[in-house]
Each structure stands twice: as C-alpha cells, then as structure tokens.
Amino acid sequence: MNNTDKLDSHTPMMQQYLRLKAQHPEILLFYRMGDFYELFYSDAKRASQLLDISLTKRGASAGEPIPMAGVPYHSIENYLAKLVQLGESAAICEQIGDPATSKGPVERKVVRIVTPGTVSDEALLQERQDNLLAAIWQDARGFGYATLDISSGRFRVAEPADLETMAAELQRTNPAELLYPENFEQMSLIEHRHGLRRRPLWEFELETAKQQLNLQFGTRDLIGFGVEQAHQALRAAGCLLQYVKDTQRTSLPHIRGLTMERQQDGIVMDAATRRNLELTQNLSGGTENTLAAILDCTVTAMGSRMLKRWLHMPIRDTKVLTDRQQAIGGLQDITAELQTPLRQVGDLERILARLALRTARPRDLARMRHAFQQLPEIHRLLQPVNVPHIQNLLSQVGQFDELQDLLERAIVETPPVLVRDGGVIASGYNAELDEWRALADGATDYLDRLEIREREKLGLDTLKVGFNGVHGYYIQVSRGQSHLVPIHYVRRQTLKNAERYIIPELKEYEDKVLTSKGKALAIEKGLYEEIFDLLLPHLPELQTSANALAELDVLANLAERAETLNYNCPVLSDKPGIKITGGRHPVVEQVLSEPFISNPLTLSPQRRMLIITGPNMGGKSTYMRQTALIVLLAHMGSYVPADQATIGPVDRIFTRVGAADDLASGRSTFMVEMTETANILHNATEQSLVLMDEIGRGTSTYDGLSLAWACAENLASRIKAMTLFATHYFELTTLPEKMEGVVNVHLDALEHGETIAFMHSVQDGAASKSYGLAVAALAGVPRDVIKRARQKLKELESLSNNAAASKIDGSQLTLLNEEVSPAVEALEALDPDSLSPRQALEWIYRLKNMV
C-alpha cells in the first residue's frame, strides 16, 4: 500500500511510515522499531515470501488491519544478503531521534539503500568475485556502457560497436545490477538478467553527466581521462554515478577516475567464445573444471578477482605482457616465501572502499593494521629481485609506518564486531575515555562488593546482584528466602522462582555506571570517526598499494602454477602465425587420470587453415580449445602449457564449438550454430584465431556439407584467418588440393577387431575413416545394433558411387561428384534446329521415359 492521499485517517506512526515509503515505492522499506526492523502492507507480504519470515497483522490503521513482517535488528545483514542474491533492493530506515524527548513518533530517516550492485559489506559480497553495478545506453550512434565496482572504486566505460559486442560485454562483466533507460529498444539483450533497474531518460542527460563526473573527480573537464568525446559512454556513466550517490547517501572519495576500455587494446571474444572456452564458468553454470579453477591459487581475495579480470580481458600490449612474464620468472624462486605475508594482507581493496564510505567496522581497521605489518617482510623479500616491473610494484606498495602506529595505538588487539558494542579504542589512546572507563569499572567493582556484603549481612546465600536491559540493576533472592529481606528492599520484578529488588544505594550506582558507560561509548564513537578522518587523506596511496599487492599476488600465483604444472614462457612475436610444440589442454590434463598426449600446432600465412578429421572422442575439440587457451594465457602474461610457443599478433578469438537449443529465445541448435557462424564471417580478420567444430551438422547432409564447404572457402581465401576446422565431412579433405594455405591433419586411432584405441596424437594428412561404430560400441549401444550397422555400412560402401547412397544423413561418402542424368546428357547432345516438329514430339516422350 503506497497511497498517501488519506494520511489523516492513519495513526501518527503509520503516517510517518507512509511518507517514507512514498519516497521509495519500488523497494522494500525496513522500518526500525526498537529491536526489530518491520515491514508493512505489500512490503510485508513480499518479504515473507522472499525471506521465509512470518506474516502477521499489527492492530489497525485507517480501519484496516496492517499486514506486518519483521526481522531482529542484529541479524539484518543475513536477510539483506539473501535479498541481494535475489536481485532485490532495500531501504534501511533508522530511529535518529531520542525516544525520551520525542513528542509523537520518534524521528526516523532512511540512512542507506542496499542494492545488488552497490553493496560493500563483506557479509553481502562473494569475496573472490567482482560485484559490478552497470548502466547501459543506446541511441542511433551505438551503445554506451559503464561499470563500477563500488567495493574497489574501479570505474570503466566502453562504447560497444554493435549488438554482438554489447552482448559479449554483458557476459564478460556479468553485473549484479543493470540500469537502463525507459526507452531502451533492445530489451531482448537484457530482459533475462537479475537486478534490472529502469531509469528515467533525464538521468542519462549528457551535460548533467559531465558535470557530475567533473564534480566527483575534482576536474574541469574529462580530457585527461580520454573520454571527452565518448558521449554514449558518458551518458551511462552519469546515470550510474547519480544512482550510487542516491543509494549511498555519502561522499565517494575512492572513485577517483574513469578508464575507457577500447576494443583494439585487447583480444576480442564474443559471448559464445567465453562460454565455450569455460574460463570462469563451465557449460553447466558451475565453476568446476574451468580455467580459473586450475589457475587460481591466489592467496588474497583481491588477487583472485584481478586474475579473473585478466582471464576475461587478454591484452595486446606486448610491453605489459613482457613485464608480467619477466615478473613471473623473477618470482619463481621465492613464491612460497612471498605468499606467506601476502596471505596475511587480506582483502585490503574492499576494506579501503568501506573506509571511503565510512562504513568500515572495527575489525576492518584491525585487518588494515595487520596488512601494514606485513609490508616490511614483502619489501625484504622483493628488494633483491632484479626485475624492473617487480621494483615498480614494490614502490607502489610503499610503507605506512605512521598509519600502522596510529592503528596500533588506537585499536585494541581483537576488537568487537561493532563500535556500539564498546571496547574498540585501546587504553592509553585518550585520557578522557580512560577516566570514564575507570569510573564505569570502579562502579562494577563496587557492585561486586555490594553483593558479598549484603549476602553476608543478611545471611541469604541465594542473594546476587544482576542487570538486564529492561529493569537495570537489581538484587535477586530466591522465592524460598524472599520473606527474609529487610523492609528497605523495594520489589522490582517477580519471577517464577525468585524475587528481584532495588535499594536506593544500588539505584545511585546504577545511574553512575550507566552514565559513565554511556559517556565512554559516546567518546569512543567520536574517536572512531576521528580515526577515519586521519586515514582518509591517505586513500589514494592506500588504493595504489592495494592494487600493487593484488598484482603481486596474481604474479606469484602464476609463477607457482608455472612451476607446479610445468608451463613455459611463450615468445610474443610481431610476425603473423602461431607455433606450438608439445601443447596441452590446461584443464583436461589436470582432470585426466592417465598422461595427457601433447600435440604440436603450426599456423602461418602459408598454412592458414587446418582441416581436422578423425574419430569422435579422438580429441579434435580438445586440440582446438587448447590452442585458444594457450593463446589466451599468453595474452594475459602467463606461462603456457606447452614445451615451446611462439604467438604472433591475435586480435580476436572465435569459437563455433558444439551447440544446444536456445529454448529461451526460441532458437534451434542449427539456428544458434548459424548465428555464431555469421558473426565469425562478418567480424573475423587475418589476425583472428577461429575454431570451427562440426559446422553444418544440425541440418540435412547436403545443406550441411555445402555450408561447411562455403564457410571453409570463405575463411581460407577471403578472410585468411588462422582457422582450425574440425569436420566429419570427408569431402572437405579435398580442399587443400584446390586452395593454398589449407592443410589436412587428423587425430590418430588404432582399431583391433571390434575395439578401438584413441592415440590422441595429431598427424599430417586426412583420417582414413571415422570409427563411428567403434565409438558407438564404447558408448554401450547394444551389440545386435552395432552388428546390423556394420552390415549396413558394408552395403553403403559398396554403393559409394551411387547418388542414392549419398542421401543417408551423416554418411561420409562422396557427395559432391553426383552422377549426371542420362536425360541431361541426351539434351546436351541435341541440336533443336535440325529437328522436325514430329521428331521434336518423339524426343519429348523419349526424355520423359528417361526421367
């Protein structure tokens, strides 16, 4: 219920609630009442379903019972985490007035808005995964796209050229929340995503966006960021920044700049390629047996997130890549020693974001202190490493002795979770705080003495002094001894087996204790905020340090992986082509129980396309994918699973590997296959690496073979891309005779009787047969079916020159050299000018009989 027209008919408290709710109509409003956050009306119904909490009713307002649901204040974060995972947002409304001095309802206001893309609390985040907020814009000039990781301050923009590139960006970044304009036309691109937020058009206004961004960065213009003319991207960035300011309700000092991502800087991979190569997610949607699962042994969460960004954004800048390679080489001897202090650094990046948002908790500051304490050891280990990039990173890491000293003096060794729990600031840091604490502690000592004195004086062995939040301090005596208490004991509370009393002396000390504790807590909160003020001026250097530490973690991890998994340093060449000796699939070799068979590969301007034939299960797909993964690893600066590798310039990686029906979009397997193929033929260049696996198998044999042939021809002669073309159509093995730069290779297998051994080794030349029946037998197809299939195969092979045999779907017999019809031959031999009308009529009957 969001109707505020008849506020007067509601109670004062519900009037206050409805006014606040009207400001946040589309999200759940958690309204603080004492020890609970309550939700009312439609919010209560929705929350009870989403969070599995009880739906009750609270009295009545405007003559109607009020649906209500609530959660305890101390467990709110658990419920928010669940909402965020469901793509929902929530407004948190706190009591900011004093109940003792308030006339009518206590003053309340919304102090924060939690949304999937703007959370920074560690309880709400997956620690080894980026959590991005994104905004998308589209007009006649193309797309604009902006992403922000509020938990690090990383702000990126791009202008994807077309729908395909935009889809790839969405898949790569996978935002937790996506803002889009109300007139967005390509809803099919985003409608299946969680966390969609429709925004009014004026939030994407260009001049407003520029003003917002300049104000945030403290600049006069955006020329220094290289985005001044990127109008579509700036519209998206402006909307995104405004949304963050609206939800965070605080300044954002950790967002200090904007980076333009340009397609030409990296290796472009479309959405299908990212999916097929299983970089961070497997085809089932899980994370097992992915490249990241094998490669990621980083010791910090921020390092893990950086590694995954590198995986998804292979770069082309050979200077950066060579720096990384040299750093990996330089770290190989000290990896284990370096990872020990790095592990202790923890997730400094996200702690700094919470510091910037002033939401850092006491334990965040303790972790920051612990991170600073590791820096001297990191410097000691890295100073002897004579690699320029390592020394550059080390200078960025820096040392923060003064801040370390501040936190060592100010924060206790093991602080509580929240400032409001007290006991965060260390003794000796502030004299006034120590005085009030001494008063509180002294009063506590007095109460202990009072208990002993009263027990001995009255001879009541069950007497004890206690405290609870409702009744304050009390003297408790068992029901059996309650008749023995003196007259000045005033009864405060009756329990089943005991009575509780108050005496004037106890009341006096209660006031003293509560006053001193309250005063100490107030001072402590003030000092805690002051510590933020002392740390925040150093935020830029701290962020630089955290980024350098994350990169050191990634490089040390890649050094360890190279050593453990026997990877070698690839050579990055400016000459076109790819030459790999002893290449292996990084994931498959770790999953296999038997040794992995390594294979060579050579692609060059004279050897542009490999036509790959061989049995199913022979390893064609593995061979193709491992080539793409080796190229990708080389372009993130990593060592690669090969004895040697020389990689020339690569601008894009395309894969047309396997397919499944896209039922959600109503597209068949063949339609998916052809869409991906069209994308390759439109966008591949001479420097692209293209993997084509079983093209044309989703339709009839004639159609499929014709398409496969035409695609192979186009890639080899017009585009001249570096192509691995796996096929079951043996007709394609004649392509090398017809075209330059095309070569046959095959995966070897040995057949013995009815059994088959896959050798998994790549040999020159075409495969002699497909071994399909042997594979079927391995798969458990019944023996009588296999036997019948062998009979049929012999029949078909004996009819291999008969055109009818070529119509059997999936056969690998000659299909292109069709027999010429006798009727056609007779027609070609005829001279129509020499025929009389009678002869012509006879020929028509004769031809009819031939057909």
Swiss-Prot record:
Chain segments annotated as coiled-coil in the UniProt record: none
A single GO molecular function term of this UniProt record: mismatched DNA binding
TM segment ranges: none
Annotated keywords: ATP-binding, DNA damage, DNA repair, DNA-binding, Nucleotide-binding
Signal peptide: none
NCBIfam families xrefs: mutS1, PRK05399.1
Protein name: DNA mismatch repair protein MutS
Organism ancestry: Bacteria, Pseudomonadati, Pseudomonadota, Gammaproteobacteria, Enterobacterales
Recorded name of the encoding gene: mutS
